[in-house]
Amino acid sequence: AGARRFLVRRHLLAPPRALPPEPGSVLRVLDRLGSLQFDPLEVAGRNHDLTLLARVGGYRRSWTDELLYRDRVLYETYNKMLSLVPTAELPWYRVTWDRRREGHDGGAFDEHAPLVEELLGRIRDTGPLSSTDVKPRATIDWYWRPTNQVRALLEAMAEAGILAIERR
């Protein structure tokens, strides 16, 4: 019982929604938990929003979007799964990014080098780019299913820490 009480308090679940209704409470949750699973798809709600709703009184989903996309104090990366992490912790992810990059070097990055250079050049020249902004290319075998080369390579560059998501 003592361990259960400790864990519930440690994870900011007791008392329910006790954190004040302000954007800083989102950062407090991330500081305590380290990361939040991020799933931009909505069935019952976005996963990170549901997690924050349980902890922050009067939580508004716009707070997380602003911290992530406008203020850039949060960052979208992989931490076992797609997660939101504080931007201040990015240096700790370099090891994972380097490993991901090594996995794509000699693979997708080399096999599709002209397209990688084209995408990076366009981003340098014009700024953020969506896979829908580029003429579709043939599909390649990707993690779960065949995927358009453009989308796959942009995803691989994000996994390798070369690119970041500007906005979903």
Residue ranges and their predicted role:
Residues A1-R168:
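Long, low-complexity intrinsically disordered regions
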